[in-house]
Amino acid sequence: MVDPKDWLEFGQKFHGHKCPAMPMGLRVGAAAMNKIGVERAKDGQITAFVDLGDNHCATCYADGLQVIMGTTFGKGNIKKTHKGKWAVTLVDRANGKAVRVTPKAEAMLQNKQSAFFKDYREKGIPASKVPSEVVDPIINNVMNAPEEKLINISEVFDYKLEPHKDSFAGFVCEECGEMTVEEYGRLKSGKQVCIDCAAK
């Protein structure tokens, strides 16, 4: 069983500040992994589809997911669906089994009514400037709340992911001299160039 408490300290270092959203990602990620019986990804064993959008509160949640599940931008096994929600669908590539986990709306609303949000974040104060005595109790609540009070966990279901193969082919752009992945190359006046140079 994956224990989110084992990842809190590392998660805060990785994330850069204390807030309730990153720990919520730890809790949700752990619940998803435990439900389908997977370990933290060392490579691309699992893929996470996160319903977050851009430029809204609590996107810090995604860092908690990345930390605990090992689904990272670098490995390409975490994708944003841009739905403006906090659900994650975790897929085990080995067997095509998946689970959808989301924080309960009540838990999210409770956090949004806290002094952390009302007195600081909504007034434009960065999370790193919020006093520990304000943020620590909310983090404690998120990390210690019973799972059934904090998150919704779906039944396991089938999820078909098309197999993919990493590309190792590349070239040096004939205009800017930067290394470029072959499939992103363009032809411009008979020269092999990158997307940026093709647009000039």
Predicted regions and their residues:
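Non-transmembrane, aqueous-exposed alpha-helical and coiled segments at domain scale
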Residues: 1-18, 25-200
